[in-house]
Amino acid sequence: MGFQIAIDGPAASGKSTIAKLLAERLGFEHLNTGATYRAVAVYLKEKGLNPSSPREELEKALKDVKVDYRDGRVFINGKDYTEKIQSPEAGILASDFAKLDLVREHLVRIQREICDDKNIVVEGRDIGTVVLPDAQLKIFLTASLEARIERKLREYQKKGLNVSREEVERELISRDTQDSSRKIAPLKPAEDAVVIDTTSMSVNEVLQKILKLVEERMKA
């Protein structure tokens, strides 16, 4: 078994930035599970399906789905979906589909297969509690809503997306509500997770804190 690091937290808490840098610094692989959810959600929508579609239709579509995650890009059946999943709509769509047990079970199985026997940093919503419950280090990042709105807005602006502050706030509040209230794997820290509030911390401060934790766990 490789050394697995689970990074959980709400949208725009800093998971992706920290996970990528941590993986680079350690020479580990990196998996963004949120990207896999968004890609599958967009794929299902393209197939004319929605979260209210008949279960048998969703099951049939999911059986045909092969997900690959390479170098920060996500592929469905060999087709690159990375650019298609950048919008706020894709994030909300993913949260809607993630309420369905058959979607979560299918993706959790795929995510575990990707992580098997690897030194890997995995980011998402339920990594430490569901996907990798035996991960050697579990981190739960959090931040104030205001800080997360600012971060998400900058992220969209860097991608050239014209999104208003109000749209970002609505997106985050909607995703927070869905993440914390869903019956299946609601967003919460694992009992053995280290919770880090990143509101007033720089990226480097967060990174150094986690690197110190990694060093301690590797020595244990």
From Swiss-Prot:
Q: Among its keywords, does the record have Cell division? A: no
Q: Which UniProt keywords apply?
A: ATP-binding, Cytoplasm, Kinase, Nucleotide-binding, Transferase
Q: Which residues form the signal peptide?
A: none
Q: What are the BP-aspect GO terms?
A: nucleobase-containing small molecule interconversion; pyrimidine nucleotide metabolic process
Entries under SUPFAM superfamilies matching the protein: P-loop containing nucleoside triphosphate hydrolases
Q: Which reaction does it catalyse?
A: CMP + ATP = CDP + ADP; dCMP + ATP = dCDP + ADP
Where does it sit, as one GO cellular component term? cytosol
- Which InterPro entries does UniProt cross-reference here? Cytidylate_kin, Cytidylate_kinase_dom, P-loop_NTPase
Q: Where does ATP bind?
A: 9-17
Q: What is this protein called?
A: Cytidylate kinase
